[in-house]
Regions:
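Compositionally biased linear targeting/interaction segments
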Residues: 2-3, 7-319
Length: 319
């Protein structure tokens, strides 16, 4: 009798253990399946968000294509400069959220690249002057400029106050210099000595795309000072013309506006003069796409260049 009870007890215990094992297996399968479903769902949402962001870029490009015919945004069709510079107001407009249907949305903001400092084009002196004019201590600005140049240049020879790969390795840095162009302005956060507060202060005036030309009719004084041959006197005179809504159409008008020392400095620097622009011909489009109720946001950045009256997308990045 006891033997029978022992057998039945063992069988019951075995059944319980089997039930526990099957439950654990079912739970694991459920967790794995849910994880995979989330991956698939996020992938699908990312794909649709990417399409929405790309739609934002294309819709904005189509709007820009109409401006040479209609005149610039915010200006009369027959207003001064509307034919010569049809994009003059395009960089100051931001599109509201646009619904595409099927619960997809985008928002796109155009930025005049001529009002930004291209950190892949600017030289060390120009970068130092930009940083100093942006209220950064001159000694700190000089060190930052050298470290940024060391990160960007192709060699491993450290500037006096800069930093190369070995310096980052010794300090246990997570990211090492690429010895090539920056892919995004926020990569500056990896440069030695860069703080969040300083980066957040200067990043809105930085870019990594475009020709590096600066629009004298719209750029701020710090951005103007990043140009070779641009003096503080010249930048102040240009800023005064901007405040007075006096448009500068060409280099001759600019030189006539400047005090003699500032004019001579610019005339003696053909590289700086070549990087002057008097109209908006490059726009950086920053588009965000998403689905209703989804936390996934897809960002697409594109460079649109005006060739004659045609806007062409010459570069884009999606992340």
């Amino acid at each position: 009798m006891r033997r029978g009870r022992s057998v039945r007890g063992f069988a019951l215990l075995s059944a319980l253990w089997l039930l526990v094992a099957l439950s654990a297996l079912a739970l694991e399968v459920s967790v794995v399946a849910r994880h995979r479903r989330l991956i698939v769902a996020n992938t699908l949402e990312s794909v649709r968000g990417e399409r929405a962001a790309a739609s934002g870029v294309e819709h904005e490009r189509a709007r820009l294509a109409r401006l040479p015919v209609r005149g610039g945004d915010g200006a009369s069709w027959n207003g001064a400069g509307s034919a010569v510079d049809p994009w003059q107001h395009a960089g100051s407009s931001a599109t509201d959220t646009v619904a595409l249907g099927d619960d997809a949305f985008y928002a796109v903001a155009p930025v005049d690249v001529g009002t930004l400092v291209n950190i892949n084009v600017v030289d060390e002196v120009g970068l130092t002057r930009f940083l100093t004019a942006s209220s950064i201590d001159p000694m700190t600005a000089d060190a930052f400029a050298q470290a940024i140049m060391d990160w960007r240049d192709a060699d491993d020879f450290r500037r006096l106050r800069g930093a190369e790969r070995d310096d980052y390795i010794k300090n246990g840095a997570r990211e090492l210099p690429s010895n090539g162009p920056f892919e995004a302005a926020d990569q500056l956060r990896f440069v030695r000595g860069m703080s969040r507060s300083i980066l957040s202060h200067i990043e809105p005036q930085l870019t990594v795309v475009g020709s590096g030309q600066v629009n004298v009719n719209k750029a701020s004084e710090p951005v103007l000072l990043s140009l070779p041959g641009m003096t503080t006197l010249a930048a102040a005179a240009i800023a005064g013309a901007q405040r007075g809504h006096r448009r500068i159409e060409n280099l001759r008008q600019l030189l006539d506006l400047l005090p003699v020392p500032a004019r001579m400095a610019l005339e003696q620097n053909p590289i700086g003069a070549a990087r002057l622009a008097f109209e908006t011909h490059e726009l950086e489009l920053r588009s965000v796409g998403w689905l209703k109720g989804s936390p996934v946001r897809v960002h697409e950045t594109a460079l649109v260049t005006r060739i004659g009256t045609t806007p062409l997308v010459t570069w884009r990045r999606t992340e």
